[in-house]
Amino acid sequence: MVNFRRLTLAAVTAIFLIYGGLLASLFYYFDGAQFLATLVSERTLFSVGLSMAAATLATLAALLLAIPAAYALSRYTFPGRHLVDTLLELPLIVSPAALGAMLLIFFTNPLGAWVQEHALQFVFATAGVVLAQFVTIVGVAARFVKAAFDEVSPRYETAARTLGATPSGAFFSVSLPLARNGILAASALTWAKAMGEFGATITLAGTMAMRTETLPIAIFMRLSTADIEGTVGLVLLLVGLGLGALFAARLLTRRRYNG
């Protein structure tokens, strides 16, 4: 009879070997001097700076919507609640390229054209990078934050209300502090997802060097010119930034459960 524990551990090992093997294969083409040259190049510094700035702005904007929306979905019953809750999964079931195409099509209609002409230029512009990232992460951010609020018992808010707190007062003084670590972890994960966003960004903002060239787009452009060593350097940089964000999220989640 197959040992169940060994079977499950074998599955864990298989997953580790898949991703670990992919990461290890990068070092076949790794060159230290080329890696350093890639890191300090003007285009790399620009793409890293743009990626981090855009991801930060997109994450902050997403959280401004996600936190109140997630709280409403976690606490209230209202018409269309299940529909909205389902739509949060849209970025997970629709490819980023499709989301980017939706945005591009929107800006070709009269309303979108008016926004482009009188408000802000998004198509093939830096603002389009932020918008593309925002659209791909806001639903995911709301899902993560809702999970944090779901773990906070409504009884704490009820107790605060009986002591005279208003609904908003109970939210800011009780629910938000108790969900803080979960929200911070959600922020880190959302930021990491924004950093790695490619499909929607390239569809809406294009691949203009030193203008809309985020780190994932820089990887694509290096690979398209058969610059394998440069591609490896940028991939390792993106992986390092992403793993750093994931480590922060994991640490915050652990603190959340350990009190």
Predicted stretch roles:
Residues M1-D31, E42-D150, V174, L178-G199, ...:
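Membrane-water interface segments at the C-terminal ends of transmembrane alpha-helices
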Residues V152-Y156:
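Short glycine/proline-centered loop/turn elements that form peptide/ligand docking sites
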Residues A160:
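The alpha-helix within a helix-turn-helix
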